């Protein structure tokens, strides 16, 4: 369902940061200021948000992978829930340097986590001493927290979706180095440079974060559903050409 400007207003998307913290590169997206707080121009935000969703929808239809990134307290739960709903990988704890640029190292950690999960499933921890089981449990919990959201990501993602580019500067830099497109929410205190699909908006309010993230997840789900429908329709069309009615009375 399309998001309206009223919904953006109700979610507080238009509230930027204090004017003294502004980044001049965001000037084209600022409507003005009130009580020393910059007000973001939603007439600019809405079409740019829709462009970002269109890209996410097309990428998903082509079986692309979008990595969701949001590690701030107010976005962690939303990022995990919406990414899982869309069947996409996510990072909602600390971003580990090299997650993209040194993916080989990440793969080693992912293998370790999967091996530990298999060991737990097989009941191997029951044969461990209390101390060994405790150490195993601690290591596994640490791995789940840091890389659990990307354990099924088979390779480098086709794009990343980021909430707060300043807080996730390393993730954006790594994506830029590898030429991975970046969809991101950019508030008035950060630069839109290096972002392929800019969504000018509040990156702190939980309602605003939920709105952006649910929108991207919806676009992905819709894109995949459209792709499946096209395949089904194409298959039906092919079968229709070959269909021959048989008269049983003949």
Swiss-Prot record:
SUPFAM superfamilies: Ribosomal protein S2 (SSF52313). CDD domains: RPS2. The lineage of its organism: Bacteria, Pseudomonadati, Pseudomonadota, Betaproteobacteria, Burkholderiales. It comes from Paraburkholderia phytofirmans (strain DSM 17436 / LMG 22146 / PsJN). Pfam families: Ribosomal_S2. GO terms for biological process: translation. This is Small ribosomal subunit protein uS2. The gene is rpsB. The keyword Transcription regulation does not apply. Keywords: Ribonucleoprotein, Ribosomal protein.
């Amino acid at each position: 369902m399309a998001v309206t400007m009223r919904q953006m207003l109700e979610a507080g998307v238009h509230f930027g940061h204090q004017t003294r913290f502004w980044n001049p590169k965001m000037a084209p997206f600022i409507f003005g200021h009130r009580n020393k707080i910059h007000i973001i121009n939603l007439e600019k935000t809405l079409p740019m948000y829709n462009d970002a969703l269109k890209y996410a929808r097309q990428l998903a239809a082509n079986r692309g992978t979008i990595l969701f990134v949001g590690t701030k307290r107010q976005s962690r739960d939303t990022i995990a829930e919406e990414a899982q709903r869309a069947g996409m990988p996510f990072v909602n704890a600390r971003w580990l340097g090299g997650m993209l640029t040194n993916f080989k190292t990440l793969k080693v950690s992912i293998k370790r986590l999967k091996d530990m999960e298999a060991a737990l499933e097989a009941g191997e921890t029951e044969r461990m001493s209390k101390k060994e089981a405790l150490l195993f449990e601690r290591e596994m919990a640490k791995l789940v927290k840091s890389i659990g959201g990307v354990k099924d990501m088979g390779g480098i993602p086709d794009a990343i979706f980021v909430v707060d580019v300043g807080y996730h500067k390393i993730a954006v830099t790594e994506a830029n180095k590898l030429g991975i497109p970046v969809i991101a929410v950019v508030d008035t205190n950060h630069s839109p440079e290096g972002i392929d699909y800019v969504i000018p908006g509040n990156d702190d309010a939980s309602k605003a974060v939920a709105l952006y993230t649910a929108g991207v997840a919806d676009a992905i789900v819709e894109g995949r559903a459209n792709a499946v429908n096209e395949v089904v329709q194409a298959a039906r069309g092919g079968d229709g050409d070959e269909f021959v009615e048989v008269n049983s009375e003949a």
